[in-house]
Curated annotation (Swiss-Prot):
<feature type="transmembrane region" description="Helical">
    <location>
        <begin position="182"/>
        <end position="202"/>
    </location>
</feature>
<comment type="similarity">
    <text>Belongs to the nurim family.</text>
</comment>
<feature type="transmembrane region" description="Helical">
    <location>
        <begin position="88"/>
        <end position="108"/>
    </location>
</feature>
<dbReference type="InterPro" id="IPR009915">
    <property type="entry name" value="NnrU_dom"/>
</dbReference>
<dbReference type="Pfam" id="PF07298">
    <property type="entry name" value="NnrU"/>
</dbReference>
<keyword id="KW-0949">S-adenosyl-L-methionine</keyword>
<keyword id="KW-1133">Transmembrane helix</keyword>
<keyword id="KW-0812">Transmembrane</keyword>
<comment type="function">
    <text>Catalyzes the methylation of methanethiol (MeSH) to yield dimethylsulphide (DMS).</text>
</comment>
<feature type="transmembrane region" description="Helical">
    <location>
        <begin position="46"/>
        <end position="66"/>
    </location>
</feature>
<keyword id="KW-0808">Transferase</keyword>
<feature type="transmembrane region" description="Helical">
    <location>
        <begin position="115"/>
        <end position="135"/>
    </location>
</feature>
<protein>
    <recommendedName>
        <fullName>Methanethiol S-methyltransferase 2</fullName>
        <ecNumber>2.1.1.334</ecNumber>
    </recommendedName>
</protein>
<dbReference type="InterPro" id="IPR054700">
    <property type="entry name" value="MddA"/>
</dbReference>
<dbReference type="GO" id="GO:0016020">
    <property type="term" value="C:membrane"/>
</dbReference>
<dbReference type="GO" id="GO:0008168">
    <property type="term" value="F:methyltransferase activity"/>
</dbReference>
<dbReference type="GO" id="GO:0032259">
    <property type="term" value="P:methylation"/>
</dbReference>
């Protein structure tokens, strides 16, 4: 009983760390409220700023991707109970994000500056991105994604069941709405600086690469079900018009049209 309670408390602490890092990320990326943001901080030379910022983002990318791979999960399952594995992943990710926010070096050189309607539109898209990202976690299983469900199930002494494949709401429009939301939040800004551009470019590159590994894992887990989903639903960019399916019925071919 004590071990199960400790795992539950650990999961709650981990979720609290995630909440702090997520809320700070809103201010960090958008330059709102927080004392140190993507464009606000102590000045430093350009070379140091680029190097430190890339190292910080690389640290997050390596931890986030390596710990998500099935081979790593099999390895650390030898040492860590299943009920607290996700919480550990979330806690380490959150702490690295907080380190990034703390040690980030601003590069304030302006890239673009907008005003008026254009600025308000970009601010709107920015917040829409955060809303999409947050809502996407609740469309699947928010508490499973951040480790609380596993801890509560273990606390009750029941078996942790696997998740079935579902495509609710935004997942019918794009396969990875969470990542789409992040991209919108990172890129949509009325005042883009060189530091913000570096952040957006590096994270976009990471997301595009990481999704290839995630898709491979999903195919391995769900097989033909996910393959069919990939054929029907785009990865990140929604289709403006739904493509007509020709598998079941074909449109009549005009006379003289090539076979």
């Amino acid at each position: 009983m004590f071990a199960r309670l400790a795992i539950l408390l650990y999961a709650i602490v981990s979720y609290a760390a995630f909440t702090v890092s997520f809320l700070y990320a809103l201010g960090f990326v958008g330059n709102y409220v927080v004392p140190k943001s993507i464009d606000v901080g102590s000045p430093t030379n350009l070379g140091e700023a680029i190097l430190v910022n890339l190292l910080l983002m690389s640290l997050f990318a390596i931890q986030h991707s390596v710990m998500a791979r099935p081979a790593f999960k099999r390895w650390w399952a030898k040492f860590l109970p299943l009920a607290c594995q996700r919480s550990t992943y979330v806690l380490l990710s959150s702490l690295i994000l907080l380190l990034l926010f703390w040690q980030w070096r601003p590069i304030p050189t302006p890239v673009w500056q907008t005003s008026g309607i254009a600025a308000w539109l970009l601010i709107g898209v920015h917040w829409l991105g955060w809303l999409i990202a947050f809502a996407s976690t609740h469309m699947i299983d928010h508490f499973d994604l951040f480790g609380l469900r596993q801890a509560f199930v273990a606390f009750r002494g029941t078996e942790i069941s696997g998740q079935s494949f579902r495509t609710p709401l935004l997942y019918k429009i794009v396969r990875h709405p969470l990542m789409l939301g992040f991209l919108l939040a990172f890129w949509a800004t009325p005042a883009m600086t060189a530091g913000h551009l570096l952040f957006a470019l590096a994270n976009t590159a990471y997301i595009l690469v990481a999704l290839q590994f995630e898709e491979r894992d999903l195919i391995a887990e769900f097989g033909a079900t996910y393959q069919d989903y990939r054929r029907r639903v785009p990865m990140l960019v929604p289709r403006l018009f739904a493509r007509r399916r020709t598998d079941d019925r074909k449109s009549p071919r005009p006379v003289g049209a090539p076979r």
